[in-house]
Amino acid sequence: MNENIAEKFRADGVARPNWSAVFAVAFCVACLITVEFLPVSLLTPMAQDLGISEGVAGQSVTVTAFVAMFSSLFITQIIQATDRRYIVILFAVLLTASCLMVSFANSFTLLLLGRACLGLALGGFWAMSASLTMRLVPARTVPKALSVIFGAVSIALVIAAPLGSFLGGIIGWRNVFNAAAVMGVLCVIWVVKSLPSLPGEPSHQKQNMFSLLQRPGVMAGMIAIFMSFAGQFAFFTYIRPVYMNLAGFDVDGLTLVLLSFGIASFVGTSFSSYVLKRSVKLALAGAPLLLALSALTLIVWGSDKTVAAAIAIIWGLAFALVPVGWSTWITRSLADQAEKAGSIQVAVIQLANTCGAAVGGYALDNFGLLSPLALSGGLMLLTALVVAAKVRITPMS
């Protein structure tokens, strides 16, 4: 029955893709991600200017992630039938306001308030991203549109820290956030001009968010999402000590490795739509299986710099399929409740990132250098098995 509802929901979709709106959404996402990670490269001048320690200043990143998790969970309950066009415009305005509040912050409290505004926009936008995408393009084009959005994310992740560091040294950290506010204004203008009216959820489709987990294969899917992202952060959070101590990379070498990873991630995201068109389930099971094998290879032969560098590239290519693949799964199998499913997905990912990094750090401190790799590889292997055995993918109509 649920599959029939999803089929009807997709049948009512758009006939032609609205690429201007898709790129507007992608630009907003890229700006949100860039601003989220700007403090990483500006912590020292921010801390000095505000008279706080770098550790305290780092909480400006933590509070954004914390607020984003709750925003993603409850945004669809709050906005209900409100036109999603106005909600996206509001998120773009919040992005701009956040940048200005941080730029003019004269206290740690105002800094946190500005970053909390960013968290509201970030979590809400991510929760709605899959449902927005499937309402802007025909069903057959959804994987391609999602790859555009996640491609923008990859670019933002690659350029955010180095761009912030470079500009901060020239114009100062406050003007970096002023420049980000200008990007926020551009987001508002682009969204206003390109995004069509997107009515909220009709009353007959209202359903408790967590009742979605009772649908066949959905709980398994969320568990697989948790394990794949926890596995990613269990390893990637500690890539610096692993690569510098295991493979013997210096700082410059590690920078090149991370740049290669970022480029590979962008390439993988760009081509993900072609893989997902052929088989979503194969991508969702095959990518973590390849990552599990990569972790094993790094454990056995990671002392070789060539092998370690190659694994970073393979990792970037393979993991790029994971976020696009799971968003595609939502648009296929939970099309009638895509917003609520997206809310749960984002909250699960935020929790997985936190747990993966925490457990990976504990393993590194107590069980040695290879333990985050072993943990990551084990989680990725379990993900592949759960997807293959339990996750259901609704065929594209």
Curated annotation (Swiss-Prot):
Name recorded for this polypeptide: Purine ribonucleoside efflux pump NepI
Main location as per UniProt: membrane
Pfam families reported for this sequence: MFS_1
Family: Belongs to the major facilitator superfamily. DHA1 family. NepI (TC 2.A.1.2.26) subfamily.
UniProt cross-references to PANTHER family, sorted A to Z: PURINE EFFLUX PUMP PBUE (PTHR43124), PURINE RIBONUCLEOSIDE EFFLUX PUMP NEPI (PTHR43124:SF5)
Membrane-spanning parts: 22-42, 55-75, 86-106, 108-128, 148-168, 176-196, 216-236, 256-276, 282-302, 306-326, 344-364, 367-387
Keywords, alphabetical: Antiport, Cell inner membrane, Cell membrane, Membrane, Transmembrane, Transmembrane helix, Transport
Gene field: nepI
Organismal lineage: Bacteria, Pseudomonadati, Pseudomonadota, Gammaproteobacteria, Enterobacterales
